[in-house]
């Protein structure tokens, strides 16, 4: 009875605890949520395309930079400052530099591809000195060395005419540096026989007469899906973290000036001092790039009104050479303000001294090498100048001379007047992009003057001893020229897809989940062609991904084919890059949209899912994630688990689509109007026939059972119309008027006539039979549950009593063990103390025993 009274409270408390557990389990779960458009990026290498205002600078279509093929620049460029962002830059490992270097080489090669090869000019040249006509000298001609009248030679040679079997003798003017004397032996050596300098080392190609080398600013732009990060730190040295970061779509206009030693027409530092940039300032094998904060103007001139003439060197080929020199035959030269140069040099030396412990700094010209390295080489008005910079780099700066605000140095140059640099002009120019190839630059008519700004220097250094550091001008690797402008840029790939935990869960069609074998995800796109429709539907995600991969691979193959046939299609490098950029943008967009579609998130910026968040990915709370972390920090934390999360999203969406497909199969029951459709009438007739057949079958079964039952009782009805009373036991008398007794609740069983009464009677009997059996079954189940509950409760009580009993026994045993241990320890301690005391007394009694021994001995 006590147990039965405890049942209601037990069930009440059990239900309450179960509800609390369910609520806690629902509240505590986190689910993966997909976000599209998160501000996350990663370093990447991609194809950049160009933007330029070529028409604003030069209408000549044959400009070597082919900027007419670039897209127009944005009149309102957008630059977004990234607050609280620190990004690492490295100008020495920058794919933008390598890409620009490759582009400029391709442009030079393409511009010179259709030009004439000067192989027919590799003949013997009969040369003599040149006499100028109408020579006039200005008053300041003393600034320039006039004793250089042998700079050019008038050479005659035989060439093939339009008719191949006929030769013609022509003459042309060559610079002395472009020809070498032929050594035919000591006996037959002639001072008048020469050849072109590059005939035995490389193929010479003439620059087309319409090609212009005037640099035009080129803006490098990132395609859609990518961005260019820009460091706006004014003292940024090119490597390390930058805290002032912005994002742009295009760089500033970069003039691809090909020069050595001095950087021309570049960007300036925005601080009061020069900026020193080097991969390792202590490594003398690494170049040092100096960015000036103020420009130094350099004015270069080639005097003389030269003429140009065309010489036929074969069928369909023409060679352009200098005809006559009218005016001063002097070399070309450049002028630089001495005061301005020395002020700039003082800033450079002061900055270098801070890196080299204020040692004595020596500036010297290059020790040796090719003429392009030992001189300042550049292009001026179509002519290639090679200027001697010894006057610029020939001084010694002690610690006291550059740490003070003075410009004192051990130099013989006048720092107040102009510094004049002697220059040579070469028609045969070694190509800077590769070894073993040269170019013949046709002469330019008339006077040539170009004014440029020196915005940087390229230096090398060597340590003479512990007190001196020698710096020399360097260059030759044009990557340093591009690096001096691209130091503050880097290309990143925008990752708009992000996943994070939230408490929101997608409401889905629940269904028992089946395990999907991992092998299904590795089937090929066509590998499921022979599978069943059900098996192939599992690989739809893989097929969609591989379909896009096939498109991407096809586009890549097309681009490679176009690049291979670039010379046939007459496409510039910019055309190839624009095609690549546009295809790449489409591929990036399709890839993101493909993933969103696979996850069931098409067209959504925030998409909840049914994938539970695993704490092993990140065990941070929602407040720590959403209130204290940026998307970049969060992406770095879960980057190792992104692939796993993506896979689970695909599996979840596949299961959801399968459940929806199964639900649609039952969806026709949701619309009652469809029940009255004519197409369903045959189904209704079939169902009716099945019901009637079932009733008839049940009637037959019950009739057979009734007959069998009566036969077993030994009674047979006389007629189908006879009312058959139920049999009563001898202990149950019928009720009569005079006596009491049990009420007669029994009825006679009447056999009915007709189909409908028969159906009704059978249905009634069937329902009563089912009801009674179900009632009996429920009664049995209730009694069983009650019994199990009582037995379970008694077992729990017994288990509780056992736990209490054994807990008390363990407690008593522990107390007894502790007491025994304490007693044993106490007894042992007492014995140890007693032994120590005895030993101590024995030690104390040693002198007494010795004294007693002596006393006995004396007695």
Curated annotation (Swiss-Prot):
The record marks 514-515 as: Cleavage. Residues 709-859 are cytoplasmic. Highly glycosylated by host. The high number of glycan on the protein is reffered to as 'glycan shield' because it contributes to hide protein sequence from adaptive immune system. Residues 300-333 are annotated as: V3. Residues 29-687 are extracellular. GO terms for molecular function: structural molecule activity. Residues 127-154 are annotated as: V1. A motif (Di-leucine internalization motif) lies at residues 858-859. GO terms for cellular component: host cell endosome membrane; host cell plasma membrane; membrane; viral envelope; virion membrane. Residues 155-199 are annotated as: V2. Residues 724-743 are annotated as: Disordered. Residues 577-595 are annotated as: Immunosuppression. Residues 466-474 are annotated as: V5. Residues 366-376 are annotated as: CD4-binding loop. A motif (YXXL motif) lies at residues 715-718. Residues 665-686 are annotated as: MPER. GO terms for biological process: clathrin-dependent endocytosis of virus by host cell; fusion of virus membrane with host endosome membrane; fusion of virus membrane with host plasma membrane; positive regulation of plasma membrane raft polarization; positive regulation of receptor clustering; viral protein processing; virion attachment to host cell. A lipid is attached at residue 767 (S-palmitoyl cysteine). Inhibitors targeting HIV-1 viral envelope proteins are used as antiretroviral drugs. Attachment of virions to the cell surface via non-specific interactions and CD4 binding can be blocked by inhibitors that include cyanovirin-N, cyclotriazadisulfonamide analogs, PRO 2000, TNX 355 and PRO 542. In addition, BMS 806 can block CD4-induced conformational changes. Env interactions with the coreceptor molecules can be targeted by CCR5 antagonists including SCH-D, maraviroc (UK 427857) and aplaviroc (GW 873140), and the CXCR4 antagonist AMD 070. HIV-1 lineages are divided in three main groups, M (for Major), O (for Outlier), and N (for New, or Non-M, Non-O). The vast majority of strains found worldwide belong to the group M. Group O seems to be endemic to and largely confined to Cameroon and neighboring countries in West Central Africa, where these viruses represent a small minority of HIV-1 strains. The group N is represented by a limited number of isolates from Cameroonian persons. The group M is further subdivided in 9 clades or subtypes (A to D, F to H, J and K). This is Envelope glycoprotein gp160. It comes from Human immunodeficiency virus type 1 group M subtype H (isolate VI991) (HIV-1).
């Amino acid at each position: 009875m006590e147990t039965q009274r405890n049942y209601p409270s037990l069930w009440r408390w059990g239900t309450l605890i179960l509800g609390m557990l369910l609520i806690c389990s629902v509240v505590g779960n986190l689910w993966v949520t997909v976000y599209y458009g998160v501000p996350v990026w990663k370093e990447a290498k991609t194809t950049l395309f160009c933007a330029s205002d070529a028409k604003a600078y030069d209408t000549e279509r044959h400009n070597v930079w082919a900027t007419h093929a670039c897209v127009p620049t944005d009149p309102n460029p957008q630059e977004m400052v990234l607050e609280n962002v620190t990004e690492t830059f490295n100008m020495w490992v920058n794919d933008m530099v390598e890409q620009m270097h490759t582009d400029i080489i391709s442009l030079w090669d393409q511009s010179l591809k259709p030009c004439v090869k000067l192989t027919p000019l590799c003949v013997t040249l009969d040369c003599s000195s040149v006499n100028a006509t109408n020579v006039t000298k200005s008053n300041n001609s003393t600034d320039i060395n006039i004793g250089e009248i042998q700079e050019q030679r008038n050479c005659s040679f035989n060439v093939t005419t339009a008719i191949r079997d006929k030769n013609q003798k022509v003459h042309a003017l060559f610079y002395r540096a472009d020809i070498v004397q032929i050594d035919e032996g000591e006996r037959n050596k002639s001072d008048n026989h020469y050849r072109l300098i590059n005939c035995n080392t490389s193929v010479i190609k003439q620059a087309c007469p319409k090609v212009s080398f005037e640099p035009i600013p080129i803006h490098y732009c990132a395609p859609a899906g990518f961005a260019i990060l820009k460091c706006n730190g004014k003292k940024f040295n090119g490597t390390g973290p930058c805290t002032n970061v912005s994002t742009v779509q295009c760089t500033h206009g970069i003039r691809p000036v090909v020069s050595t030693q001095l950087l021309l027409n570049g960007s300036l530092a925005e601080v009061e001092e020069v900026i020193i940039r080097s991969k390792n300032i202590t490594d003398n094998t690494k170049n040092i790039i100096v960015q000036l904060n103020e420009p130094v103007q350099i004015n270069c001139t080639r005097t003389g009104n030269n003429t140009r003439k065309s010489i036929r060197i074969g069928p369909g080929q023409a060679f352009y050479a200098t005809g006559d020199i009218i005016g001063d035959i002097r070399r070309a030269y450049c002028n630089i303000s001495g005061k301005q140069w020395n002020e700039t040099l003082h800033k450079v030396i002061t900055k270098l001294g801070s890196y080299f412990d204020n040692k004595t700094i020596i500036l010297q010209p290059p020790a040796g090498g090719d003429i392009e390295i030992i001189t300042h080489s550049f292009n001026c008005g179509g002519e290639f100048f090679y200027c001697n910079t010894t006057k610029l780099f020939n001084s010694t700066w002690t610690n006291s001379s550059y740490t003070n605000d003075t410009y004192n140095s051990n130099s013989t140059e006048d720092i107040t007047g102009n510094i004049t640099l002697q220059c040579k002009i070469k028609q045969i120019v070694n190509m800077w992009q590769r070894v073993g190839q040269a170019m013949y630059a046709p002469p330019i008519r008339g006077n040539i003057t170009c004014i440029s700004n020196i915005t940087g220097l390229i230096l090398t250094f060597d340590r003479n001893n512990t007190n001196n550091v020698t710096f020399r001008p360097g260059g030759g690797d044009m990557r340093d020229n591009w690096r001096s402008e691209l130091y503050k840029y880097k290309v990143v790939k925008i990752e708009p897809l992000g996943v994070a935990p939230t408490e929101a869960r997608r409401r889905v069609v629940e269904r028992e989940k089946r395990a999907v074998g991992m092998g299904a995800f590795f089937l090929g796109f066509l590998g499921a062609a022979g599978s069943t429709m059900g098996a192939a539907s599992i690989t739809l995600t893989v097929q969609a991904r591989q379909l896009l991969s096939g498109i991407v691979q096809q586009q890549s193959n097309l681009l490679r084919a176009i690049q291979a046939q670039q010379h046939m299609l007459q496409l510039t490098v910019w055309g190839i890059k624009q095609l690549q950029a546009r295809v790449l943008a489409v591929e990036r967009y399709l890839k993101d949209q493909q993933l969103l579609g696979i996850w069931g998130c098409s067209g959504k910026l925030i998409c909840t899912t049914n994938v539970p968040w695993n704490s092993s990915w990140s065990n941070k709370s929602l407040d720590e994630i959403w209130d204290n972390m940026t998307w970049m920090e969060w992406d770095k934390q879960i980057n190792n688990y992104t692939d796993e999360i993506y896979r689970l999203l695909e599996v979840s969406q596949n299961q959801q689509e399968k459940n929806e497909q199964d639900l649609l199969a039952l969806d026709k029951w949701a619309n009652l109007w469809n029940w009255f459709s004519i197409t369903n009438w045959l189904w209704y007739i079939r169902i009716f026939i099945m019901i009637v057949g079932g009733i008839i079958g049940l009637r037959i079964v019950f009739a057979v059972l009734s007959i069998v039952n009566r036969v077993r009782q030994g009674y047979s009805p006389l007629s189908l119309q006879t009312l058959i009373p139920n049999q009563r036991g001898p202990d149950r008398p019928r009720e009569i008027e005079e006596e009491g007794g049990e009420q007669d609740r029994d009825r006679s069983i009447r056999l009915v006539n007709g189909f409908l009464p028969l159906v009704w009677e059978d249905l009634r009997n069937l329902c009563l039979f089912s009801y009674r059996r179900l009632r009996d079954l429920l009664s049995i189940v209730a009694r069983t549950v009650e019994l199990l509950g009582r037995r379970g409760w008694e077992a729990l009580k017994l288990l509780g009593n056992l736990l209490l009993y054994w807990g008390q026994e363990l407690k008593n045993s522990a107390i007894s063990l502790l007491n025994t241990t304490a007693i044993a320890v106490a007894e042992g301690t007492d014995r140890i103390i007693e032994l120590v005391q005895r030993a101590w007394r024995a030690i104390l009694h040693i002198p007494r025993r010795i004294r007693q021994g002596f006393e006995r001995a004396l007695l």
